[in-house]
């Protein structure tokens, strides 16, 4: 695997540079493949060496690269050494490259790339990831969908790297909307509708009561009183609220299952209605709580009255706010999990909110506030189903399934499937996830169903098609050829390009683990699929001599394995037929 070759190169460099091999590992990177020319397999960035050097005179880097290359020697691992633009390049012995990469992919299976030396020495951590977090009775909007798939990716990757991950869905299950919802259900609610479709019915009630409250002050007052009863622990009010919450969570679990997403804990703002009062007392005891003329309580994070740094933590009637409950939740999670890192995945509109929450934790004396991290993402515009704006996650999933079924029906090569609905949903979800993950998470983008479902080009449909096609090859030829293979049979440019690309998988995983951007993995998998498409046309298995056919089948099997591994990390279930 790449790290074995990296170490061999690092050991030779360490003797010349008088540096420990460990210091050189991350400076040696696999070279991205080129369609125009054959490239080396690894390169050493001379810039990065000079950054490690305390001598800042920085002589001509190209001269330095040439001098260094002249001191190095080819050996059983490295067959050629050359210089590039500010780099020293290394070509690996071709037979060794073929044998090592294919053996490693087959032996490591789903762990390929994750055992790399790039990750060795990194401590195993306990990581809390809070994501999805819809509001009960309100729309499950596109922001919640993005939070769900991004949070799931981060949790998947961290878990694959051996960290202990706790996935939390922090529901919006408290606040004034429940005053409206409780009052609304007493006025317009139906028990049968609630039991049969809780999310839909609660949303309908919520929309109706909001209209009524806008026109009728007595309804607005009743809603306010209902929420105050909830805050005071009234048994009847709490019983109704609990029913709404339990039925909603049951429905969420069912729908998340279709997405392939699960949570270790369904938490919510309601858990912290009492603990938020303790937070207010602590803020007051530290002299941080200020009262306004309106009777609200605020914290001045600037210390000099800067209006942009004022954070409201209590309403005039003494009830808690979102920020107060987030503070209580963070403190509770540290007590419960003693986490090393806590990651919040929400849209970029909440950036200031989390900055203030983390800052308040710090001035309250919690040094671990530095372990809290916000992963923000941009806005998606224009995602609509045929029924109109997205209201529920299930609307999106049903739309995906319907559109993909229609696409599959219109394509002549579509196979006969045991469960076309399931396949359509998996392919459609891959399409949705790849469209979302192709760019920077922070970027806004305009959604297009037509672009999502293109079977050609850089789409999720193309990834699924490639996986299914490679699986079909294994089904057709696998039994007879998957024994020992001759590495000398994989020296064509198409084979070498694939092997070079497989070398890079650990670096791509490392990049994504550092910046939480799935685009590195997406770009890698799309390139791998394009390479496989070219190889599928030129590297025939049928009618080839057995040892050639066997070697090629091993190569395609390795591609399919790595493709499946990457897709699963992104939250995509690979399909075997489509």
Curated annotation (Swiss-Prot):
GO terms for biological process: arginyl-tRNA aminoacylation; mitochondrial translation. It is found in: Mitochondrion membrane. The keyword Ion transport does not apply. Keywords: Acetylation, Aminoacyl-tRNA synthetase, ATP-binding, Ligase, Membrane, Mitochondrion, Nucleotide-binding, Protein biosynthesis, Transit peptide. SMART domains: DALR_1 (SM00836). Pfam families: DALR_1 (PF05746), tRNA-synt_1d (PF00750). GO terms for molecular function: arginine-tRNA ligase activity; ATP binding. Its EC number is 6.1.1.19. It is an enzyme of class 6 (ligase). L-arginine binds at residues 133-135, 144, 322, 326, 350. Residues 1-16 form a transit peptide. The modification N6-acetyllysine is found at residue 568. The keyword Cell membrane does not apply. A motif ('HIGH' region) lies at residues 133-144. GO terms for cellular component: mitochondrial membrane. Gene3D superfamilies: Arginyl tRNA synthetase N-terminal domain, HUPs, Isoleucyl-tRNA Synthetase, Domain 1. Belongs to the class-I aminoacyl-tRNA synthetase family. Catalyzes the attachment of arginine to tRNA(Arg) in a two-step reaction: arginine is first activated by ATP to form Arg-AMP and then transferred to the acceptor end of tRNA(Arg). This is Probable arginine--tRNA ligase, mitochondrial. It comes from Pongo abelii. The lineage of its organism: Eukaryota, Metazoa, Chordata, Craniata, Vertebrata. The gene is RARS2.
């Amino acid at each position: 695997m790449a790290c074995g070759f990296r170490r061999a190169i690092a050991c030779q460099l360490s003797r010349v540079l008088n540096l420990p091999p460990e210091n050189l590992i991350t400076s040696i990177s696999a070279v991205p493949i080129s369609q125009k020319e054959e490239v080396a397999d690894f390169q050493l960035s001379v810039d990065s060496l000079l950054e490690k050097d305390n001598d800042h005179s920085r002589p001509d880097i190209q001269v330095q690269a040439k001098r260094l290359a002249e001191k190095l020697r080819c050996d059983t691992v490295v067959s050629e050494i050359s210089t590039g633009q500010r780099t020293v390049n290394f070509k690996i012995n071709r037979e060794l490259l073929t044998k090592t990469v294919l053996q490693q992919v087959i032996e490591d299976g789903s762990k390929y790339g994750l055992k790399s030396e790039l990750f060795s020495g990194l401590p195993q951590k306990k990581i809390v990831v809070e994501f999805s977090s819809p509001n009960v009775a309100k729309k499950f909007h596109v922001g919640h969908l993005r939070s769900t798939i991004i949070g799931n990716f981060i949790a998947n990757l961290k878990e694959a790297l051996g960290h202990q991950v706790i996935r939390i869905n922090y529901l919006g299950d408290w606040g004034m909307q429940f005053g409206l919802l409780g009052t609304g259900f007493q006025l317009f609610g139906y028990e049968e509708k609630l039991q049969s479709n809780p999310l839909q019915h609660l949303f309908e009630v919520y929309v109706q009561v909001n209209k009524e409250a806008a026109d009728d002050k007595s309804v607005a007052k009743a809603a306010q009183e209902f929420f105050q009863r909830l805050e005071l622990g009234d048994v009847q009010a709490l019983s109704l609220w609990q029913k709404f919450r339990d039925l909603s969570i049951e429905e969420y679990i069912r729908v998340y299952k279709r997405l392939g997403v699960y949570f270790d804990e369904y938490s919510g703002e309601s858990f912290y209605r009492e603990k938020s009062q303790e937070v207010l007392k602590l803020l007051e005891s530290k002299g941080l709580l200020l009262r306004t003329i309106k009777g609200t309580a605020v914290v001045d994070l600037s210390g000099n009255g800067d209006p942009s740094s004022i954070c409201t933590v209590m309403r005039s009637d003494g009830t808690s706010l979102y920020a107060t409950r987030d503070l209580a939740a963070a403190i509770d999670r540290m007590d419960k999990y003693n986490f090393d890192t806590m990651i919040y995945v929400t849209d970029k509109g909440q950036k200031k909110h989390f900055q203030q929450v983390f800052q308040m934790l710090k001035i309250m004396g919690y040094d671990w506030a530095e372990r809290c991290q916000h992963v923000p993402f941009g806005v998606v515009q224009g995602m609509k189903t045929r029924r109109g704006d997205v209201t529920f996650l299930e609307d999106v999933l049903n739309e995906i399934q319907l559109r993909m079924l229609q696409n599959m029906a219109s394509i002549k090569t579509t196979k006969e499937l045991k469960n076309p609905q399931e396949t359509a949903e998996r392919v459609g979800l891959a399409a949705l996830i790849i469209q979302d993950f192709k760019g920077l998470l922070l970027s806004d983008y305009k959604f297009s169903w037509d672009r999502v479902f293109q079977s050609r080009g850089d789409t999720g449909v193309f990834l699924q098609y490639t996986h299914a096609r490679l699986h079909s090859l294994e089904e057709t030829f696998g039994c007879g050829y998957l024994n020992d293979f001759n590495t000398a049979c994989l020296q064509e440019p198409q084979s070498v390009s694939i092997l070079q690309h497989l070398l890079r998988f650990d670096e791509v995983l490392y990049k994504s683990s550092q910046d939480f951007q799935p685009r590195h993995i997406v770009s890698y998998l799309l390139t791998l699929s394009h390479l496989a498409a070219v190889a599928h046309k030129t590297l025939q298995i049928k009618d080839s001599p057995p040892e050639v056919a066997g070697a090629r089948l091993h190569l395609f099997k390795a591609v399919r394995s790595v493709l499946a591994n990457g897709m699963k990390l992104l939250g995509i279930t690979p399909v075997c037929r489509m």
